[in-house]
Amino acid sequence: MTENGLGHWERVLNVDTMNPNVKRVEYAVRGPVVQRAVQIEKELKEGVKKPFTEVIKANIGDAHAMGQKPITFFRQVIALCVYPDLLEDKFPEDAKNRARRILQACGGGSLGAYSASSGIEVIRQDVAKYIERRDGGIPSNPDNIYLSSGASDAIVTMLKLLTSGEGKTRTGVMISIPQYPLYSAALAELAAVQISYCLDEDKCWSLDVNELRRAVKAGREHCNPRAICIINPGNPTGQVQSRQCIEDVIRFAAEEHLFLMADEVYQDNVYAEGCQFHSFKKVLFEMGPEYSSVVELASFHSTSKCYMGECGFRGGYMEVINMDPEVKLQLTKLVSVQLCPSVPGQALLDLVVNPPQPDEPSYDTFIKERTANLHILSEKAKMTAQVLNTVPGIHCNPVQGAMYTFPRLTLPEKAINAAKEKEQAPDMFYCMKLLEETGICLVPGSGFGQRDGTYHFRMTILPATEKLKIVLEKIREFHKRFTEEFS
């Protein structure tokens, strides 16, 4: 017995009593390689000698962390909203007008006030107008739009709505392999079933409807398939799906009675000649009422990617189409539990969907910065694929869009065996060794899912051009040494 009379005290919450679903969650983008990179950065600051002077994080799609400059107009308006006294200063008039409009829609005229749970009404109206412009006039109803703290928040919310059942009645959700680990992590946390369909690497990561049919048939043997998720442009694979592919997916969703989730956060990031972004909503409505009146769709967008790269503001939205009115009430209830999305994120989203117009003073600077950001990304996408494809043992598909490449590695058998001895996936072994020897931080392909017997890494194209050249050269040199060491 202890002095307080409580005897042996065992924690209420420990690894045996915690939610078992949380233990099943994995998120490779910030996994062991990244955690080791953080340790190495601390060691470098402490003066520990390394064969390099800095860690270059090419693991995550965080444009500003990689040195991309913010869009001037966006930051001016946000500054005015955060500190309205600046409205008396010498900011451009259109920036002041935009800030006043946003502040008038905020409680107490402040970004510090809660908003409506689905987001500030005038911003939802602006999002609807943006979608209409993007989709050639197809109507968008602000009541179908829910603002969110980044697209990830909205995606998880939608998965919560979809998840139900036990045993063979558990909800199954179709996700691509390779996939963005948000999806597998959320499904694990919600105790839903992941139904994997494979993209075709030999055809530039294209999507084959026959593979979808195979996957859903296999899924029905142990769960209840209810949804399919598509990332377009692709993460981690950098492909842009054709219009025909999108039509095929919509028909498949209708035939199999599946809810369709379209992750379109990279919609401005299209680089390859002959490629074009087509929104699922636009294609759905152009296919006619046979599909547009019945297929249930949620599409997602974000302030974090494209030319903006404003990850930290956590701005995003989802638009729902053909959702049961009673389910919409439940969705509204669910988002209200979190009170509201980030209000500064909502303000930034408003600027993304309602940027400066040609007759406004900030327009020329905005267009110049937007065009420059996208052009630089396009050049880096081409350069990355070109350089990696000169390395024997690395094969890289064209980076058609998004911010990543997902090259295939040919690894010596000796390296694969060495990885097994360390109880690591071979590409984890490769990426960890790359980090320790060069300071380059990548994400192993095994964290995204891949066909058995294949190995990859995901690398962002976001580092500044000169730094990206260094990254690519270091990878080239390392891969040669690695292959020689384990041959």
What positions do the PLM features span?
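PLP-dependent class I/II
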Residues: 1-118, 122-487
